[in-house]
C-alpha cells in the first residue's frame, strides 16, 4: 500500500505463512511511514478485533472511569450443519486455536498451553450455557495499550464438541502443522 500510495484496511492482523504466530508489532512498525505518506492504515476492523475494541472504547467513555478487567467472550458453538466447520478462514482458525494462549495479567502477557483453561459461560436471554476456552486473540495487544488501566484482559471462545473432536483428530494425524511435510522424498 505504501509503494502504491493507497490506504490500508484489514479485518484481522498479518500472519506469516511459515510461523504459527501473529502479533501487531509487525504492522505497527509501519505506522510512522503511513503517517509521513499521509495514508490511513486501519487494523483489525472486523468483529474481533474491531467491534470488540469499539465496544470497549464506548464503555470506557460513557460508563466507567477505569476498566481493570476485560473478558471478551466469543460464543459460537454452531456447526453450520456440517461435521466440521470453522467460523473464519479454516487455516487461520486452526492456527489460533492450537497456538499457545497469551492473556494479559498484572501488566504483562502470560503464556499458557493451548486450550488449557476452560470455563462455563451462560449467555443472557435463554441462549444457553457454553464451554469457553481462553485463547490468544490479537485485539488484546491493542486494548492493553489503549486502555492502560487494564490489569487483566482475556479472550475466550466456545467450540462445539464435534469441532473439538475433529480438531483433535487433525492434530493426531499431523494436519494442524504448518511446516512442510515430505511425501515420496519431495
Language-model regions, residue ranges each:
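Short secondary-structure transition/capping segments
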Residues: 21-29, 54-56, 166-168
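Conserved beta-strand segments of alpha/beta enzyme cores
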Residues: 7, 40-41, 151-154
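Rossmann-fold NAD(P)-binding glycine/threonine-rich loop
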Residues: 2-6, 11-39
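Short-chain dehydrogenase/reductase
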Residues: 24, 49, 53, 133-137
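Adenosine-phosphate binding glycine-rich loop
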Residues: 30-77
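C-terminal catalytic/substrate-binding lobe primarily of soluble NAD(P)-dependent oxidoreductases
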Residues: 62-186
Amino acid at each position: 500500500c505504501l509503494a502504491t500510495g493507497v490506504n490500508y484496511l484489514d479485518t484481522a492482523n498479518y500472519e506469516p505463512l511459515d510461523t504459527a504466530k501473529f502479533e501487531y508489532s509487525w504492522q505497527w512498525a509501519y505506522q510512522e511511514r503511513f503517517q509521513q505518506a499521509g495514508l490511513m492504515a486501519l487494523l483489525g476492523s472486523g468483529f474481533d478485533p474491531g467491534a470488540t475494541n469499539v465496544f470497549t472504547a464506548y464503555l470506557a467513555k460513557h460508563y466507567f472511569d477505569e476498566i481493570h478487567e476485560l473478558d471478551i467472550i466469543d460464543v459460537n458453538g454452531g456447526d453450520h450443519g456440517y461435521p466440521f466447520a470453522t467460523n473464519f478462514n479454516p487455516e487461520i482458525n486452526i492456527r489460533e486455536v492450537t497456538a499457545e494462549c497469551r492473556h494479559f495479567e498484572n501488566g504483562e502477557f502470560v503464556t499458557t498451553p493451548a486450550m488449557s483453561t476452560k470455563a462455563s459461560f451462560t449467555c443472557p436471554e435463554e441462549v444457553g450455557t457454553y464451554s469457553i476456552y481462553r485463547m490468544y486473540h490479537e485485539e488484546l495487544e491493542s486494548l492493553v495499550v489503549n486502555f492502560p488501566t487494564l490489569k487483566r484482559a482475556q479472550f475466550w471462545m466456545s467450540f462445539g464438541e464435534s469441532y473439538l473432536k475433529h480438531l483433535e483428530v487433525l492434530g493426531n494425524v499431523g494436519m494442524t502443522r504448518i511446516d512442510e511435510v515430505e511425501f515420496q522424498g519431495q
